[in-house]
């Protein structure tokens, strides 16, 4: 029998790893200055992975398919696999949230953050390698 994984207060940490079935990470966004929204993630989909957010502080707007929803502190959003989605902080106030994802999505995010050059072609290839698709 394996032991449970316990993390200190997440505050920017990750619970789980690419070796687990799912990963929980606490993320923060500083807020959006006036003007068009600054997407935290580009419009994309995961063919075989669900993804969810639980908002701890602030507000996120999530585009799920053709619908936009606003999620305030205490609410959550689940995006089913195969559904185009993106999200952003519509406020100038910071947002703090938990991102609940599969190990595959976690590895995708790690690979994106490790990229030296984020060209559209390179990003599309990383998404494709993780059974996902970059849509914009």
Regions found by a protein language model. Give the residues of each.
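A short glycine-rich, His/Asp/Glu-containing loop-to-beta-strand
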Residues: 4-43, 49-50
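Double-stranded beta-helix
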Residues: 90-136
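A generic "binding-loop/recognition-motif" signal
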Residues: 48, 67, 83-84, 93, ...
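Short beta-strand segments
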Residues: 41-43, 64-69
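Short beta-strand His + acidic residue motifs that chelate non-heme Fe in jelly-roll/DSBH
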Residues: 62-63, 79, 85-91, 97-99
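Short acidic-glycine-tyrosine-enriched beta hairpin
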Residues: 3, 18-20, 66-84
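Glycine- and acidic-residue-biased ligand/ion/polar-headgroup-sensing regions
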Residues: 48-60, 65
């Amino acid at each position: 029998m394996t032991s449970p994984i316990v993390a200190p207060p997440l505050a920017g940490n990750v619970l789980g790893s690419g070796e687990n079935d799912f990963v929980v990470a606490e993320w923060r966004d500083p807020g959006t200055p006036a003007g068009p929204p600054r997407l935290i993630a580009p419009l994309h989909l995961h063919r075989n992975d669900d993804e969810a957010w639980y908002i701890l502080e602030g507000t996120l707007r999530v585009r799920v398919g053709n619908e936009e929803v606003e999620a305030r502190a205490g609410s959550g959003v689940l995006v089913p696999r195969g559904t185009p989605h993106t999200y952003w902080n519509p406020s100038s106030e910071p947002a703090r949230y938990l991102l609940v994802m599969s190990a595959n999505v976690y590895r995708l995010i790690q690979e994106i953050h490790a990229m030296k050059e984020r060209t559209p072609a390179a990003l599309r290839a990383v998404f494709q390698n993780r059974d996902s698709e970059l849509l914009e």
